[in-house]
């Protein structure tokens, strides 16, 4: 299927379904989708099938991402910290990430969620993605930014793809249909003048399988490095990470101001010894205006007062940088904690 036809399908479907339907979809909705194993709407069921129990006034729903990305394991570390330092219980839900999570925050089925800062901006302002055009999510509010969500273009050495220009005519997995990853991928390809490609749509783990099987030539992945699905792929295949640098990076940043410079360190993935220049968006914690100031401040304080208990993204998540790249209005509970 051509890239134009795939985008048309997405826009038509999005226009019909609207934002509300996103909360219930099972596809990957954002940069950190991975594989999803949802347990309903996230009210009381946790990813492993357990029940949170306890007082409903202290039970909070936290929507993460797919199990193959960074959002889900990081959210579970937040869960451990919050539950050890407050009276709140967090029900961490595996989801399709950013776009789906915005829908869940909008309808109140999620109290907190991890999303990309660009998707947050689109949703809050009713722009950027057809789903949000004229459907601004007015109750969406920010808590904290966390770490760069690196744009990783992964391929196998056997494809011969080494540069962005080599993607012309290729079969590319741009992420799940309607996801933040797909939005970012299409923005980047358009910005560098690549329009002739066959677009496939699937989550990170499935894209990894497609690469290994030779069904696609390259895949876009959006998430903090290292991404588990790419790590797994690199253990059994010779992978190549395509850089976004120089004039191409300048063109991408000119086309979309939320992209920032980023570098994947050499050695992050097996067989990729040199650093790879690319771009990134930001992962952030979001909530909705219906969550109390007390709950948001207490959860925020528990996390940022105990960052030494984290094992994921410890070089990036700090209280000092937690408002860098914040693209939407801050919740009053978060503002109280950060003194904004």
Which residues make up each language-model segment?
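Extracellular/periplasmic Venus flytrap/periplasmic-binding protein
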Residues: 175-190, 194-220
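A short beta-strand structural signal in non-transmembrane regions
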Residues: 283-288
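Short solvent-exposed strand-capping/beta-turn motif centered on an Asx-Ser/Thr pair
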Residues: 290-292
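Glycine-rich, charged/polar anion/phosphate-binding loops
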Residues: 205-206, 226-227, 269-272
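Short beta-strand and adjacent tight-turn residues that come in two discontinuous sequence segments
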Residues: 114-115, 220-222
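Terminal disorder- and signal-encoded targeting elements
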Residues: 1-131, 137-139, 144-145, 149-150, ...
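Short, ordered loop/turn segments at secondary-structure junctions
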Residues: 118, 177, 224
């Amino acid at each position: 299927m051509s890239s134009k036809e795939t985008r048309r399908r997405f826009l038509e479907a999005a226009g019909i379904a609207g934002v509300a339907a996103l909360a219930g979809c099972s596809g990957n909705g954002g940069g950190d989708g991975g594989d999803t194993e949802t347990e309903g709407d996230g009210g009381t069921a946790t990813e492993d099938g357990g029940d949170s129990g306890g007082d409903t006034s202290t039970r909070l729903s936290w929507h993460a991402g797919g199990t193959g990305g960074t959002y889900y394991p990081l959210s579970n570390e937040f869960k451990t910290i919050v539950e050890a330092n407050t009276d709140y219980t967090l029900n961490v839900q595996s989801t399709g990430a950013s776009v789906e999570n915005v829908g869940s925050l909008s309808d109140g089925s999620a109290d907190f969620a991890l999303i990309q800062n660009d998707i947050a901006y689109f949703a809050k302002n009713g722009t950027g993605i057809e789903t949000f055009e004229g459907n601004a999510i007015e109750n969406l509010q920010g808590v904290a930014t966390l770490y760069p969500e690196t744009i990783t273009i992964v391929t196998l050495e056997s494809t011969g793809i080494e540069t962005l220009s080599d993607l012309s005519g290729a079969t590319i997995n741009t992420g799940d249909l309607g996801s933040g990853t797909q939005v970012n991928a299409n923005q980047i390809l358009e910005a560098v003048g690549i329009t002739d490609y066959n677009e496939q749509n699937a989550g990170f783990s499935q894209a990894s399988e497609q690469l290994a099987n030779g069904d696609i030539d390259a895949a876009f992945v959006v998430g903090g490095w290292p991404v588990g699905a790419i790590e797994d792929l690199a253990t059994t295949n010779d992978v190549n990470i395509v850089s976004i640098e120089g004039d191409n990076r300048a063109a991408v940043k000119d086309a979309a101001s939320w992209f920032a410079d980023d570098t994947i360190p050499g050695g992050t993935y097996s067989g990729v010894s040199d650093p790879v220049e690319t771009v990134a968006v930001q992962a952030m914690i979001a909530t909705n205006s219906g969550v109390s100031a007390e709950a948001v401040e207490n959860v925020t304080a528990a996390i940022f007062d105990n960052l030494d208990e984290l094992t994921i993204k410890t070089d990036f998540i700090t209280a000092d940088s937690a408002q860098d790249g914040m693209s939407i209005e801050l919740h009053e509970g978060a503002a109280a904690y950060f003194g904004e």
